[in-house]
Swiss-Prot record:
The lineage of its organism: Bacteria, Pseudomonadati, Pseudomonadota, Acidithiobacillia, Acidithiobacillales. It is an enzyme of class 2 (transferase). Keywords: Cytoplasm, Schiff base, Thiamine biosynthesis, Transferase. Pathway: Cofactor biosynthesis; thiamine diphosphate biosynthesis. It is found in: Cytoplasm. It holds the Pfam family ThiG. This is Thiazole synthase. Its EC number is 2.8.1.10. Catalyzes the rearrangement of 1-deoxy-D-xylulose 5-phosphate (DXP) to produce the thiazole phosphate moiety of thiamine. Sulfur is provided by the thiocarboxylate moiety of the carrier protein ThiS. In vitro, sulfur can be provided by H(2)S. It comes from Acidithiobacillus ferrooxidans (strain ATCC 23270 / DSM 14882 / CIP 104768 / NCIMB 8455) (Ferrobacillus ferrooxidans (strain ATCC 23270)). InterPro entries: Aldolase_TIM, Thiazole_synthase_ThiG, ThiG. HAMAP family: ThiG. One of its GO terms (cellular component) is cytoplasm. Belongs to the ThiG family. The active site is at residue 101.
Amino acid sequence: MRKDPLVIAGREYQSRLLVGTGKYKDFAETRAAIDAAGAEIVTVALRRMNLGQSKDAPNLLEFLPADRFTILPNTAGCYTAEDAVRTCRLARELGDWKLVKLEVIGDPQTLYPDMRQTYDAAKTLIAEGFEVMVYSVDDPVACKTFAEMGCVAVMPLAAPIGSGLGIRNPYNLRIILEQATVPILVDAGVGTASDVAVALELGCDGVLLNTAIAAAKDPILMAEAMRQGVEAGRKAFLAGRMPRKLYASASSPVDGLFFE
């Protein structure tokens, strides 16, 4: 395959699959799934995982060395801009991380983002020098606003977090992609490899997922499937699919037939 890196905040990555670290039975399974997925960027919820905050609990970084993986701290569990900003500041103190995934939840049932709180947090974080990858609704206006204000990537949801419903509104995603000036990565809602392939076929720069792997009957096998789905979808996008037609079009030649 041609050289086709994912570029975020000026850094190149060969994998377009970003993965989370929650819901696995232990850190060993987490690492095995990440390796099977081929992921280079691994997102971690600072409010739920130990990255050095506690000396008495296992440290995830012992399984995910920083020289091999890009750790992407996220603000999962935050419901206000203030909490999200505080969490990102903690990430910078713990590991000098400035690339962060911002999410500010507005509703505990749907886990949809609170866009006002997210905007306020993004504004503060960007001003403080953070490189913000922002979780958003699949609203073209909101996604464009986040890009214009300086977010290094915009991550619209495909469906509610952990739902596994797949891409519910490909048409909004197409509009978001048409006007994109920063990488667009689907975040949340994918359930299986075909969902990932569709996202990449549409032109998304990548996909971030967690539950689709961790909640599978065989997480390691599903991680492999997700990696292959990303690769197939990206290749199909670069190749350019045939146009859709209402009527049939024979693939065999119609002239020079034997019985003519």
